[in-house]
Structures are given as structure tokens and as C-alpha cells.
Amino acid sequence: MSEPQNGRGALFAGGLAAILASACCLGPLVLIALGFSGAWIGNLTVLEPYRPIFIGAALVALFFAWRRIVRPTAACKPGEVCAIPQVRTTYKLIFWFVAVLVLVALGFPYVMPFFY
């Protein structure tokens, strides 16, 4: 029997895609801020050509997560996870947290020149 769809996978995919989209820019700054150094940090720029693909994947995953989480409770059968109010509230909070992280990650390359 398959597990019911609850939007958790789409949230994870959106967050992962956002991290990958900003890895070329945010990664080196975070590593330098943590005290790491070395020429290998420059190798993260190899991900730059794939940034539009990662951005698209993040936005598509967030759209599907939003569609699954914000759907009406009437679409849920009684006893399913999506019918429990506390779980719905938790998923909505996690969704908005991930959405803000995605926006920060997507906007970071435009703010990055102020730090270097």
C-alpha cells in the first residue's frame, strides 16, 4: 500500500534545489565565514551553469508543495494526516519557512557583491 501524499517530499525537493541553486555563491561565503579556506572552494563555481535548472526545480517543487498543503480539508479523508489541524498548521509553518529560505537563496547572488 502506498503512503499518502502530504507535500513533505515537495518541500524537501524545493529546499534542496534552492541550496543547490545558491551553492556557487552562498557556499564559498559561508565556508570562508566559518574559517575554511583553500583553492578548492573555487571549485563550487562549477555549479553556476546549472543555477537556472536548480532555480526552476525549486520553484516547481514549492508550487507542488503549496498545492498539496493549502488544499481544502474536504479533499482529505477522515483519519488522514492532512485532516488533522495540528499537522496542517505544522506543514504550513514548515512550508513558509522553506519558501523564505528559497527566496533568500535565490536572491543571495544579487546581494553577494556587497560582501566581497
Swiss-Prot record:
<keyword id="KW-0479">Metal-binding</keyword>
<keyword id="KW-0813">Transport</keyword>
<keyword id="KW-1003">Cell membrane</keyword>
<keyword id="KW-0472">Membrane</keyword>
<comment type="similarity">
    <text>Belongs to the MerT family.</text>
</comment>
<feature type="transmembrane region" description="Helical">
    <location>
        <begin position="16"/>
        <end position="36"/>
    </location>
</feature>
<keyword id="KW-0997">Cell inner membrane</keyword>
<dbReference type="GO" id="GO:0046872">
    <property type="term" value="F:metal ion binding"/>
</dbReference>
<dbReference type="GO" id="GO:0015097">
    <property type="term" value="F:mercury ion transmembrane transporter activity"/>
</dbReference>
<feature type="binding site">
    <location>
        <position position="76"/>
    </location>
    <ligand>
        <name>Hg(2+)</name>
    </ligand>
</feature>
<dbReference type="InterPro" id="IPR003457">
    <property type="entry name" value="Transprt_MerT"/>
</dbReference>
<feature type="transmembrane region" description="Helical">
    <location>
        <begin position="94"/>
        <end position="114"/>
    </location>
</feature>
<keyword id="KW-0812">Transmembrane</keyword>
<feature type="transmembrane region" description="Helical">
    <location>
        <begin position="46"/>
        <end position="66"/>
    </location>
</feature>
<dbReference type="Pfam" id="PF02411">
    <property type="entry name" value="MerT"/>
</dbReference>
<protein>
    <recommendedName>
        <fullName>Mercuric transport protein MerT</fullName>
    </recommendedName>
</protein>
<keyword id="KW-0475">Mercuric resistance</keyword>
<keyword id="KW-0476">Mercury</keyword>
<feature type="binding site">
    <location>
        <position position="24"/>
    </location>
    <ligand>
        <name>Hg(2+)</name>
    </ligand>
</feature>
<keyword id="KW-1133">Transmembrane helix</keyword>
<dbReference type="GO" id="GO:0005886">
    <property type="term" value="C:plasma membrane"/>
</dbReference>
<feature type="binding site">
    <location>
        <position position="82"/>
    </location>
    <ligand>
        <name>Hg(2+)</name>
    </ligand>
</feature>
<feature type="binding site">
    <location>
        <position position="25"/>
    </location>
    <ligand>
        <name>Hg(2+)</name>
    </ligand>
</feature>
<keyword id="KW-0614">Plasmid</keyword>
<comment type="function">
    <text>Involved in mercury resistance. Probably transfers a mercuric ion from the periplasmic Hg(2+)-binding protein MerP to the cytoplasmic mercuric reductase MerA.</text>
</comment>
